[in-house]
Amino acid sequence: MKRNLFVTFLLGISILSSSCQSGSGKHANVSRDAGYTVGKVIGIIDGDTYDLLIEGNKTIRIRMDGIDAPERGMPFYKVSKNYLAKLCFKQQVRFKAEGKDVHNRNLGFTYLSDGSEVGHLMVKAGMAWHFKKYNSDKELANLEIEARNARRGLWYDKNPMAPWENRKLHRQGISTKGSFNIQPGQE
């Protein structure tokens, strides 16, 4: 009887200690079981897209949901890209998939080891827009308003061109390279 109680006690301690491990290292499967993919950021494409090295030495391209950052050739592109690198390059992150985008990139939310969501940090710092067309997160909307009011990051320019406007003009054959204040209808 005492032996069975002791074995049960040891088994309970073992289960409890394994369930308390974080998803930040050798117990990556704990996070994956909770709907997350754990990996290391190995490449920064721009301010809203990066490459994640996951289990099996596989690389997946991630497009952060809810935000849109300046595209290559747009003002503030390098600053936004470098800020994302500062936040997560060579860091282990947790990725929560929401699906695929039109370019077949993995779309979702990225979390740092402290639990911060990277897209929220990018918008708060004025390094990206809240992508309202595809995301209705009120916190992201408020973070964008705060960054705009404080003139942080890209909001230092009174009227920066949003990436979706840049893409629209590009599809129409209109170059926006080096243009900070072009507005729809002013082409």
Regions found by a protein language model. Give the residues of each.
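Small beta-barrel nucleic-acid-binding modules, primarily SNase/OB-fold domains
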Residues: 2-187
